[in-house]
Amino acid sequence: LLTGCGSDESEPSTPPRPQPSEVEYPEVSEDQRVSITTSLQNKDHVQICAHRGYWKDAPENSVKAVTLAIENQIDMIELDVRTSKDGEMVLMHDTTIERTTNGTGKVSELNYKELLSYNLYHDGALTEEKIPLFKDILLAARGKIYIDIDVKISDYKAVYNLVKRYGMLSQVLFTVYDVSTARKVINLDRNAILLPVIYEMQDMENYLAVCKPLPVAQFNSAAFTEDILAKASGNGVSLFKNI
């Protein structure tokens, strides 16, 4: 069972992050921890997933939100991935940055250098946290916490390739909202671990036909019914529920 929770730029206090042209993506060895699939087989342990990281004490989708989740021994974090104008994968839930930063504009219409010039809010207060690169989050989380990736872009392949490059495929869930997207991910790698969102019984049946074995699925409130849950249990599907 998984349950989801929901500066002065002229004199920066910390060294600036690399600009897009300088971003490096090192090869790393495979993460040897127990896979999510194996971990979910422990039915005596309710795993906690921190939605957008540990946002209670840090900006959502930030490096600090990830490190605090690790420090508080959370089992998993959920993160949202988008792409900047110049093709860098960053963390941001919304299509625009107004709600979470002191900047304006769509993520897809801003270069990473522009995104980096803004700071993230937490509880209405501006912090020193910046919009992080997805790869920085993977490196911070690697070997320490599982990840549920809510991919907000159509290019699942780019996200998959980076996760694979960092040896984390057994540690990551890919959230999917429809069967066609599930097929795209499966075509990339039959062993990729999907987290389909279930709205009705037909969804459960469709995903089982495409993804079986299906280790876990997320159920919205309308799908949280006895017959759908029985169908999931009978097919070895663990429950993921936002509360």
Segments from the language model and where they lie:
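Sec-dependent bacterial lipoprotein signal peptides
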Residues: L1-T3
